[in-house]
Amino acid sequence: MSFPAFSAEKNDSATQVRYKTQRVDGLNIFFREAGSPSRPTIVLLHGFPSSSHMYRDLIPKLSVNYHVVAADMPGFGYSDQPSVEQFDYTFDHLASVMDHFLDSISVTRYSIYIQDYGAPVGFRLFLKHPERIQAIITQNGNAYAEGLRSVLGCVDRPLLERKKSRN
């Protein structure tokens, strides 16, 4: 996938950010969307303790050439924030909700831009649907055992064994 130069000057209706809410797994998921759905899609997964708001300046720039989707994960931003008794705030569960969210808005082929807390969620999406992910762009993605356990279990078990032997 090539990434054309961005033109921040263009500001037509295709680059206007749309603010929406989608009901997924009993939760209201808030998201920002811009660009034409006929273009390649980039899904932006935010960090902790942030929300899709962190991408407010990036979304219009990307939307000149891409369809951009940035959701607030459950417990963040304008999405529902159920109590820990009502919702399992694990990376596995967050990834499951985000997977169902993307299905519900008919996004089935996309690149992911992952940052911080969004990295373990994005990697789980990739493990579940490698055929859907066209590219992974990471910015300061979390790289600790809890966040990457299922990823490292598939990719580099010797790395985990070396880490355990040092402790």
Language-model features: where?
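Serine-hydrolase catalytic-loop signature spanning alpha/beta hydrolases and amidase-signature enzymes
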Residues: S38, P49-D57, V68
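Recognition helices and adjacent regulatory flanks at domain boundaries
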Residues: M54, M73-F76
